[in-house]
Amino acid sequence: MITPKVLSGFKDRLPKDAIQKAQLLAKVSVVFQSFGFVPIETPHLEYAQTLLPDASSDIQKEIYRFKDHGDRDVALRFDLTVPLARFVSLHHQILGMPFKRYAIGNVFRGERAQKGRYREFTQCDFDFIGSESLVCDAEIIQVIIASLKALDLEDFCVSINHRKILNGICEYFGIAQVNEVLRIVDKLEKIGLNGVEEELKKECDLDSNTIKDLLEMVQIKQNDLSHAEFFEKIAYLKDYNENLKKGIQDLERLYQLLGDLQISQNLYKIDFSIARGLGYYTGIVYETTLNDMKSLGSVCSGGRYDHLTKNFSKENLQGVGASIGIDRLIVALSEMQLLDERSTQAKVLIACMHEEYFSYANRLAESLRQSGIFSEVYPEAQKIKKPFSYANHKGHEFVAVIGEEEFKSETLSLKNMHSGMQLNCLSFLKALEIIGENDEDL
């Protein structure tokens, strides 16, 4: 006999969990659509050569790569952005530019499994392709904020940086291996200052003084300073080199655009330590954390990549986008008790006291569904205790009971499972009125 078990880093999703996830995905999808983003789908499995060029060395170690039955070198996608690059290169002539897309799907990374981090997880990506305008960057941040608010989250912060600022800092210190240094700096929250120092010494052969000065500069944060105060504080950096100048100027323009949108300034701050480990980012980058659950890591991250299609096409298409980590958000929302705890999406359970009443019960259920009330019929004629127990376990809000009197008069008795109140022999319209008084969760 086979012992049923699940691989580490993977998980089954029980009905309650699957319902919660579906509800969250539906909410963020509405936000994406409200900004004009359209859905696309790409395969879970790609040619390995499609995925590998833009993966950092750390990500390459985590990629699930193997030979398929045709002896082709293939891999499971580790994000949705690299497949987007392949997709846009293949279809750009019929898509029209600029192109705004969102994609929701599972991705795979063989990283160490821990709280809120899985080896298979769902990403919700939204991207603006084919424009260099910082208006696009501002809109992506606007969508991040609108999406989290749609999930009833208010206490969070989008930490913003620019890869040119990081490139400029490396240039200022004469560091040649920029991508490797930034890959390590990106681990600051994960392995701490001492861990980053050790890796920079070991892997980049930097001396202690350079590391000290480098880390001091990349830890510059806006914190409680106003936008104007912060930009005044870092203005001197624009004289160091063109990369720093361009990066800071772009952030100043971005902040002007975000200010015009009247977004609360508490929701976004500049943080020079935000690097994003993926090598394809070239411009503004950002990570979003929940202020009371920072140990969970980023729940939404992204940035600008101005060489999106360089590996697939001579025609270069730039883009900017972000990805919402829905699985991490589920962990957070669960701890905040902001999730629906029911194991059913049906609001009403219909219970019959005798086999011959099922024809009426099924007609009643269909009438409720046509009125927008999700309903199910308990499939066995039982003593009423068993259907009530079932409804309590699943989370039905109402139980409609069909006994002899209800069957003969074509009425129903209705019990509110939350309050315990029961009303007998109601007409369909009266029952519908009562059930519909609290239908916002349908």
UniProtKB/Swiss-Prot annotation:
Record GO terms (molecular function): ATP binding; histidine-tRNA ligase activity
Protein location: Cytoplasm
Keywords: Aminoacyl-tRNA synthetase, ATP-binding, Cytoplasm, Ligase, Nucleotide-binding, Protein biosynthesis
Coiled coil: none
Origin: domain of life: Bacteria
InterPro entries xrefs: aa-tRNA-synth_II, aa-tRNA-synth_II/BPL/LPL, Anticodon-bd, Anticodon-bd_dom_sf, His-tRNA-ligase, HisRS-like_core, HisRS/HisZ, HisRS_anticodon
Catalytic reaction equation(s): tRNA(His) + L-histidine + ATP = L-histidyl-tRNA(His) + AMP + diphosphate + H(+)
One biological process term in Gene Ontology: histidyl-tRNA aminoacylation
Enzyme class: ligase
PROSITE patterns: AA_TRNA_LIGASE_II
GO cellular component, one term: cytoplasm
Pfam families per the UniProt record, alphabetical: HGTP_anticodon, tRNA-synt_His
EC id: 6.1.1.21
Subunit structure: Homodimer.
HAMAP family according to UniProt: His_tRNA_synth
Family under the similarity heading: Belongs to the class-II aminoacyl-tRNA synthetase family.
Protein name, UniProt field: Histidine--tRNA ligase
Species in which this protein is naturally found: Helicobacter pylori (strain J99 / ATCC 700824)
Name of encoding gene: hisS
